[in-house]
Amino acid sequence: MNDRVLRVLEFNKIKELVKGYAITKSAKEMVLDLKPYDSVYDVKEHLEETKEALDILMRKGNPPFEGLYDVKEAITRAEKGGVLSIEGLLRIGNMLSVTRKLSDFLARKEEEEEHRILEGMREGLIVLRGVESAISKAIVSEDEIADSASDKLYSIRRSLKEKNSSIRDKVNSIVRSNAQYLQDSLYTVRGDRYVIPVKAEYKSQVPGLVHDQSSTGATLFIEPTALVNLNNEIKELMLKERAEIERILAELSALVYKNIDVIKVNFNIIVELDFIFAKAKYGSDLGGTMPIVNEEGVIDLMDARHPLIPKDKVVSSDIYLGREFSTLLITGPNTGGKTVTLKTTGLIELMGLSGLLIPASENSSISFFEEIFADIGDEQSIEQSLSTFSSHMTNIVKIMEKANNKSFVLFDELGAGTDPTEGAALAISILENLRARGCRIMSTTHYSELKGYALKTENVENASVEFNVETLRPTYRLLIGVPGKSNAFEISRRLGLKDNVIEEAKKVISTESLQFEDLIQSLQEKSIKAENDAREAAILRNDAEKYKNRYKEKFERIESVRDNVYADARREAKQILDSAKEEADAILKNMRDLERMGISSDARRKLEAERGKLRDKISDAEARLQKKKEEQKGEELKKIEVGMEALLPSINQKVIVLSKPDNKGEVQVQAGIMKINVKAKDLRVAKETKEEKKIKKREARLNLRQVDPSIDLRGMDSEEACYTADKYLDDAYVAGRGEVTLVHGKGTGVLRKAINDMLKKHPHVKSHRLGEYGEGGTGVTVVILK
């Protein structure tokens, strides 16, 4: 990919943002080297790795990179067999700790989805617990070795501590006895030796070795003779300590050298993971998605946003190219937002082809291009003192030398900077030449000739950026299929140009041109209306789909409950019959035994008695089954009242009646949290046990206290608010509340209207009104329940 397009479309700014999420210097360098990949396979693989990292971020949070430093220099030194510094070893130890933690972090549990690429990288990580443990045991910080690094070091430092304690006692005694000769009653250290500050004129009074003097020469730092031997002993111990530390560092460095190949592989994988998660973190904050990548030259971006414009200011657009048409001409006035659309498309393509998530909705598509060319801005004319036209044409010549059917070409104000007639003719010729090669092209222009060219040329489409004449600002919404209107007359009028001047200007323009501009304006208005209608239709379609799915789930739950009830009944009936059959078999066996014994009068009596038992058992089983059927069927309701409790045998559950029977003989009932319509004739009298009656009385006393007199629906969308209010009204009705308040806020009125529409159809609502002064005004609705 050519460097000019990366610079012109400000891809470097995107890389700077991504770099801020990387931790190691090496990963930051990888980000700065990032550019579109050379094959569609590489593009898809790098997009997939970013998407996998985003999935893990969403599910597990940030990976455990804490304490990670770039260890490239330490590894290079270790590879040569050099002794590493305390800092270098500590950083390698931390890197090995991160290796272990990352391996655990990326391990997939059975219930988790597979992440092919990142799990493959995890398999390359080799945990070196022994090396990590040896370093962490020996090194405390970047400039300190632990006492426990070796027994010898521990012994040396203990001796040093004792010697230092002894010499401090000795030097304090000397300071006290020679106080009159000293500048300060303190001791200090020079060159690792304890000394005292003696006034220069009294140096003969304190025998010893002079180690230093003050800048004025008034003070000499003398090591008293009495301290020389102790200082020598401390110095010897310090030399031993330094030698032992060097031995420990050499030993640890040798351990690192022994495992250097594994350490190097681990570090390279960690750097790559750092790079991948930096891309994912940026994509997450951007609200980015993984695009679908094709090789057919098709671009289809839904709700595309320029990634460098702040979220609170950016306007999204649907941008598509490559199916019905291969060239898109964005027309309209200057400062109309055309260039932003051009840059948005080009920059999103560069991001996607570089493995970054794009600022667009799910299922957006980008195409793999071998080259993207852009002629935007006057960069070259400023650098080389060329005219605007010469600058653009120089760049266009270079583009036309290289562009082919795998190229995407972006032109800003093609043909501008020269005579309009010649400029338009050149622009059309350039477009035709590139179209013949199979290029995909997006170009902005304000030439009317190019609008006509797009209208009459196959595979070329007009587009415009919506412009608000009232505010004299573009809305940045792209309208594909509608050429742009210059709005020069209207803008001039808004800025204060006299009407008579504008009317004179209109006379200069041909009637056909004016009619063409009016036609464009009419097309724009119709396009905007159609787009708004389509957006509203999509919202309604989504709402309908949600309701459909919700009631489908309810129906499936009811069916499941009913099937379970039937299954329970069948099991119980089978148990009764099986029990009766077992007893009957036992009686029949007794009868056969009696018959084999011979038929005596006594035997006949016993036989008849057993036959009687059999008849009784069968009759008893039949009676129990019949009773079970009657219990399940229940007593029919003679009168149905709203609010009464009834039994619904099909689900073997008590329900609350919510409405009177309609013309189909159906009533609405509530079963738990579900509302369903059933035939009134299917309802039965609900019989209560004594315990249920006691519980119901207690609930009746508590219900009124449990249901609040108002509910706050602010902050919810219309669907959620209506669902919540519906459930609240049911609870309030059952609790016996006569009046409740729904708080929806004032806002735009959308939520209030949705609530109002719901209340008109609600079976429990007698009437409703907006709140009065002191009740919340138009921000609340007061509901009277039946």
Curated annotation (Swiss-Prot):
Residues given in the record as ATP binding sites: G332, P333, N334, T335, G336, G337, K338, T339
Domain Smr: 711-786
Coiled coil: none
GO molecular function, one term: ATP binding
GO BP: mismatch repair; negative regulation of DNA recombination; rescue of stalled ribosome
EC numbers: 3.1.-.-, 3.6.4.-
Key words, A-Z: ATP-binding, DNA-binding, Endonuclease, Hydrolase, Nuclease, Nucleotide-binding, RNA-binding, rRNA-binding
Family: Belongs to the DNA mismatch repair MutS family. MutS2 subfamily.
Source organism of this protein record: Clostridium perfringens (strain ATCC 13124 / DSM 756 / JCM 1290 / NCIMB 6125 / NCTC 8237 / Type A)
Keyword RNA-binding among UniProt keywords: yes
InterPro entries, sorted: DNA_mismatch_repair_MutS_C, DNA_mismatch_repair_MutS_core, DNA_mismatch_repair_MutS_sf, MSSS, MutS, MutS2, P-loop_NTPase, Smr_dom
Highest taxon above the source species: Bacteria
Keyword Transmembrane: no
Name of the featured protein: Endonuclease MutS2
Pfam families assigned: MSSS, MutS_V, Smr
Higher taxonomy: Bacteria, Bacillati, Bacillota, Clostridia, Eubacteriales
Enzyme class name: hydrolase
Subunit structure and binding partners: Homodimer. Binds to stalled ribosomes, contacting rRNA.
The gene coding this protein: mutS2
Role noted for this protein: Endonuclease that is involved in the suppression of homologous recombination and thus may have a key role in the control of bacterial genetic diversity. Acts as a ribosome collision sensor, splitting the ribosome into its 2 subunits. Detects stalled/collided 70S ribosomes which it binds and splits by an ATP-hydrolysis driven conformational change. Acts upstream of the ribosome quality control system (RQC), a ribosome-associated complex that mediates the extraction of incompletely synthesized nascent chains from stalled ribosomes and their subsequent degradation. Probably generates substrates for RQC.
